[in-house]
Amino acid sequence: MSEQAKLDPEPWAYHLLGLISPLLVISGNLLGVYEPIYAAMGVIFIWVVGPVLDVLLGETKVPRPPRDSGTPFEVLLWVHGILQLVVMGTFFWFAFNTGLNIWLVVGALSTGLSAAASAIVTAHELGHTRPRSPSWWLSRVLLFSVNYLHFTTEHNYNHHRWVATDKDPASATKDESLWHFWIKTIPGQFKSSVEIHNSKGKTGFNNPSYRGLALQIVTLLSLAFIPGYLGYFDGIPLTVGWIISSAISILTLEY
C-alpha cells in the first residue's frame, strides 16, 4: 500500500452505514403494526448482528487523518436527527396500535437503542454549536425525545472540564460496577447541571434544568391521561413505551 493511500481520509460515505439502525427501527415500527415481531428488528441488529460484524471486521490498520471539510458529517448529524423524529413518530403509531403488551416493550427497546446514537450522541455533537442556532435547537428537541434535556449542560460545562476526576459524575472509578455507576451517574449528572445553572444566577424555577424536568413530567402526564379523558385514545401505552425507550437510550449512553 502506498504512503499516499495510508494518508487518505476515510470516505465519509462509510458513515452512512450508521443509518441502518434508525431505518430498521422505522421499518420495524411500521411493519410491527401488522406483525408485532418486526418490532424486534432494531434489537436484533444492534445487540446481535452489529457486535458480530464488529468482531468479524476487526480494527482498521490504516491511519486516517481528518478531512479538510466537516460538512458531510454535519449533514449526517442532521440526517440522524431528522430520522430520530421519524423513529419516535412511528413508535408512537406502533404503541397506539399495539397497546400494553410485551411487544410494546420490544418496540421500545429497538427505539431506545437507536435513539442512544441518533438522539443523544447526535445531540451531544450539535450541543457544541452556537446557542439558539438551528443545530442547537435540534439538539434540544432530540434530548427531549429521550427525556434527557440536561445532558449537554452537564457534559459541556462539567464533564469536559473534570473528566476522570471525583468532580465528574459521568466518570466511573476503576473498580465500580456498572449498576453502581448507573445509580450514581444519572442523578449525579442532573444535580451537576442544576449547580452549573445556579452558579450563573439561574436559581429556583429559573434554572433551565428544573424547567426541563418539569416540561418532561408535564408532557408525559398529559400524554398519559388527557387523550383518554377527552375520549380520543388511550395514551398510557404511548407514555409507558416512551419511558422505556428513553430509559434504554440513557442506559446505553452511560454504559
Feature names for model-found ranges:
Residues 239-255:
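Internal helical hairpin/lid segments
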Residues 142-144, 252:
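Short, surface-exposed linear patches
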Residues 61, 119-133, 157, 251-255:
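Juxtamembrane/interface segments at transmembrane-helix termini
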Residues 133-141:
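Post-HEXXH active-site segment of zinc metalloproteases
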Residues 1-113, 126, 145-240, 244:
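Non-catalytic, topology-defining segments of multipass membrane proteins
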Residues 87, 110-120, 131-134:
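Membrane-embedded alpha-helical core segments of multi-pass
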